[in-house]
């Protein structure tokens, strides 16, 4: 299995720390940082943001329908339609993977590294990213397949294979997404849980790793229905709980909200310093970290959420695409924006905060929530634990579908075991290195998906025109039946 390499990487880092081989570790970190800088250069930023804008125009600003129709559809059920889980179950599974530490620590890191201006770029990535999430979800449902045992499978790999006859690129996407699941989906999340538990509850990281690993194993060995059942209950609770905490802080920092908005908008387009301890990271860094953390947060363009969308019971592709696109609205347009405002208002309110504290996204977030008497730290701890654990579950499902695509069902058990192992060892791995690796893999897996979305945009437009004003219409196109997750090669009928 190619995933053995990711485990070896983490074990190597751990062993290096134990032996105090700091030089080797620093070299590895420097190499990963260099690669990350190249991958997240202007080319990737233009490709991602350009795709968002292109699809916004091609779909006639689908964001309006996403908010007005998609939110309403997300709580309805298409019980007579084909699929494994409800539309709401598919949405919450996708939200479980997107509303994670990227919304809390990730935004803090963006502000720390890119300055306050990164918040606006993160938000804009979400606004325009709604169109991309819509398009990638539409083609995922359009080109999904059904296994002999009745499971629905879809995603960028199937769209590339069945829609563009590019199975080779579908395999590349599946492999990269499988690797990415260990980073964005597992290691970063468990590491964040371990950090907050150690700092606030005094629990040793290795104990946290074992507990999370056991809980993860119990759920993921139950399949998509088990994951969806947990997410349907967990996601609404954690989102409301966290948003209420943010609203309380913004109420405390009321006088600094308008100045914070002005500062964010100003530094998003011009380099320079701001008042109150804030440092402008420069235009390039503001855009780079804003867009990168926006992708980490909402995953629009990565091709991950459509894997869950493909399993939904839905009458037609447009119906589920609208539901899935609302995930980006809730994740980035609402949650990330509120986090950004909380952080920037906190820094402006406390100009004595030193540069080292601002440079640490996690510490910065902790300071912001500490403003709420007594329960502030509790809200942050509960928020990070619930957000992160739900992400671990959602990405486990994504990884499984990708592994099954290129390796068949025989690869599922080894993948699950390795996923649990990574969860167990993640708390003792360098957080900075883990985030760098995750960022790099996110960009790499996004490239094949963006190619699929752009080349299949005529199909997206055609399907949108067909169903957008007739959402109750049923798409009676037969779904191909496959023997395994190997796509069209073994399709029947």
Regions inferred by a protein language model and the residue ranges of each:
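Select transmembrane alpha-helical segments in multipass membrane proteins
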Residues: 45-50, 86-94, 166-180, 210-211, ...
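N-terminal alpha-helical transmembrane segments of multi-pass membrane transport
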Residues: 3-4, 9-10, 17, 24-101, ...
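Flexible loop linkers connecting adjacent transmembrane helices
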Residues: 61-87, 109-111, 115-119, 123, ...
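Alpha-helical membrane segments and immediately flanking helix-loop junctions
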Residues: 80-113, 139-157, 161-162, 175-178, ...
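Helix-loop-helix module between adjacent transmembrane segments
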Residues: 51, 55-56, 125-150, 156-191, ...
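Transmembrane helix-loop junctions in multi-pass membrane proteins
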Residues: 25-28, 59-63, 102-107, 183-194, ...
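Extracellular/periplasmic helix-exit of transmembrane alpha-helices
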Residues: 136-143, 247-263, 271, 275-278, ...
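Membrane-interface loop-to-helix entry segments
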Residues: 47-54, 58-71, 191-197, 204-265, ...
């Amino acid at each position: 299995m190619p995933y053995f390499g990711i485990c070896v990487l983490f074990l190597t880092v751990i062993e290096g720390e134990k032996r105090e081989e700091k030089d080797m570790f620093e070299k590895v970190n420097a190499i990963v940082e260099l690669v990350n800088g190249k991958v997240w250069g202007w080319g990737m930023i233009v490709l991602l943001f350009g795709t968002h804008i292109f699809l916004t125009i091609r779909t006639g600003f689908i964001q309006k329908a996403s908010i007005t129709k998609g939110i309403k559809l997300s709580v309805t059920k298409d019980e007579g339609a084909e699929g494994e889980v409800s539309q709401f179950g598919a949405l919450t599974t996708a939200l479980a993977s997107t509303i994670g530490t990227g919304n809390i620590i990730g935004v803090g890191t963006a502000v720390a590294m890119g300055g306050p201006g990164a918040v606006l770029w993160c938000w804009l990535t979400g606004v325009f990213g709604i169109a991309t999430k819509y398009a990638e979800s539409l083609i995922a449902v359009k080109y999904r397949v059904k296994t002999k045992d009745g499971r629905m499978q879809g995603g960028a790999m199937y769209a590339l294979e069945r829609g563009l006859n590019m199975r080779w690129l579908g395999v590349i996407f599946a492999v990269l997404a499988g690797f990415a699941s260990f980073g964005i989906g597992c290691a970063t999340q468990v590491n964040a849980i371990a950090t907050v538990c150690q700092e606030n509850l005094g629990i040793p990281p290795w104990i946290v790793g074992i507990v999370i690993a056991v809980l993860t194993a119990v759920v993921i060995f139950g399949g998509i229905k088990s994951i969806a059942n947990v997410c349907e209950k967990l996601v609404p609770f954690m989102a409301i709980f966290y948003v209420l905490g943010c609203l309380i802080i913004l109420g405390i920092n009321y006088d600094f909200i308008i100045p914070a908005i002005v500062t964010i908008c100003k530094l998003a387009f011009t380099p320079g310093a701001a008042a109150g301890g804030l440092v402008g990271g420069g235009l390039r860094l503001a855009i780079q970290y804003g867009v990168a953390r926006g992708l980490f947060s909402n995953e629009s363009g990565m091709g991950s959420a459509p894997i869950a969308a493909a399993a939904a019971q839905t009458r037609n592709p447009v119906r589920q695409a609208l539901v899935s696109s609302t995930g980006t609205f809730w994740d980035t347009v609402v949650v990330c924006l509120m986090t950004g405002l909380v952080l920037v208002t906190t820094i402006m309110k406390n100009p004595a905060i030193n540069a080292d504290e601002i440079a640490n996204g996690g510490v910065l977030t902790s300071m912001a929530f500490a403003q709420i008497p007594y329960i502030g730290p509790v809200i942050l701890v509960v928020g990070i634990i619930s957000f992160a654990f739900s992400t671990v579950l959602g990405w486990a499902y994504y990884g499984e579908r990708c592994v099954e695509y290129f390796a068949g069902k025989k690869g599922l058990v080894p993948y699950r075991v390795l996923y649990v192992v990574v969860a167990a060892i993640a708390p003792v791995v360098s957080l900075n290195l883990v985030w760098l690796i995750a960022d790099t893999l996110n960009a790499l897996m996004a490239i094949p998906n963006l190619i699929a979305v752009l080349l299949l945009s005529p199909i997206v437009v055609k399907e949108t025109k067909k169903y957008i004003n007739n959402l109750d219409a049923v798409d009676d196109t037969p779904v191909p039946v496959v023997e395994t997750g190997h796509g069209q090669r073994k399709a029947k009928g």
